[in-house]
Amino acid sequence: MNNIIDGKALANEILADLKLEIQELISQTNASPKLAIVLVGDNPASIIYVRNKIKNAHKIGIYTLLVNLSTTIHTNDLISKINELNLDNKISGIIVQLPLPSSIDKNKILSAVSPSKDIDGFHPLNVGYLHSGISQNFIPCTALGCLAVIKKYEPNLTGKNVVIIGRSNIVGKPLSALLLKENCSVTICHSKTHNLSSITSKTDIVVAAIGSPLKLTAEYFNPESIVIDVGINRISGNKIIGDVDFENVQSKVKYITPVPGGIGPMTIAFLLKNTVKAFKDSLYTLDK
């Protein structure tokens, strides 16, 4: 049953287009996009994510700067480091790898990144732009990746019923705003929702971003369900599984993303797409 969505293949298509676009920009401007990644500490999972971002960036011609800092750094000192990156005209985009140590004020750090370099889309100004509908500057990359996958397999979303399980600022909330703009009827559920399966089993599209390994079994879906599994749960060392019981659900739904190989590669692709956007926006600002 060929209903498994290959997120890696879709991401590679985006990266191939970005590579050509970057080559054209270099020929026109003699400059390249540059991504700064701020990593605090040596969390093994964070290190793997950062390496993947750097590897994919280099493949398409984006330079990277890794700023690796000690877990003992104070919030104000980290803000000072981010301000240095904000003022560096050679830096197109900045990401702060999450999670941060509990001693650091995450909200202050995310707010310190210049909105024009906030390619993660976490700055309050960019969040406000998205939810107000006034404009869309930078949007969280996982939400963009989910929307791209959904539209690939369901191009006309008008009137579709979507359940998002998860209310985070990274996935649930921004994706709900994007889907509302596509004229979907969106229901947001979470870990405290009662009778969850009675809600999800009647809907067209289910996005699982609850952070609970293999929680969603076959009873949560119907044969026409499109299932987007955003969960990344590490078990038994380096093994990664999603929020959906993939082995038992896959044959009982219309389409499903695997973990790994589903939304993860799409998130990185849109992170780099946002980096190129930031670079182009900076060129426009310099020309004014």
From Swiss-Prot:
Gene Ontology molecular-function annotations: methenyltetrahydrofolate cyclohydrolase activity; methylenetetrahydrofolate dehydrogenase (NADP+) activity
Superkingdom as given in the UniProt entry: Bacteria
Protein name: Bifunctional protein FolD
Subunit relationships: Homodimer.
Source organism: Rickettsia massiliae (strain Mtu5)
Functional description taken from the UniProt entry: Catalyzes the oxidation of 5,10-methylenetetrahydrofolate to 5,10-methenyltetrahydrofolate and then the hydrolysis of 5,10-methenyltetrahydrofolate to 10-formyltetrahydrofolate.
Pathway given in the UniProt record: One-carbon metabolism; tetrahydrofolate interconversion
Enzyme Commission number(s) of this protein: 1.5.1.5, 3.5.4.9
Keywords: Amino-acid biosynthesis, Histidine biosynthesis, Hydrolase, Methionine biosynthesis, Multifunctional enzyme, NADP, One-carbon metabolism, Oxidoreductase, Purine biosynthesis
HAMAP family: THF_DHG_CYH (MF_01576)
GO cellular-component term (any): cytosol
Family: Belongs to the tetrahydrofolate dehydrogenase/cyclohydrolase family.
Binding site for NADP(+): G166, R167, S168, S191, I232
Keyword field contains Hydrolase: yes
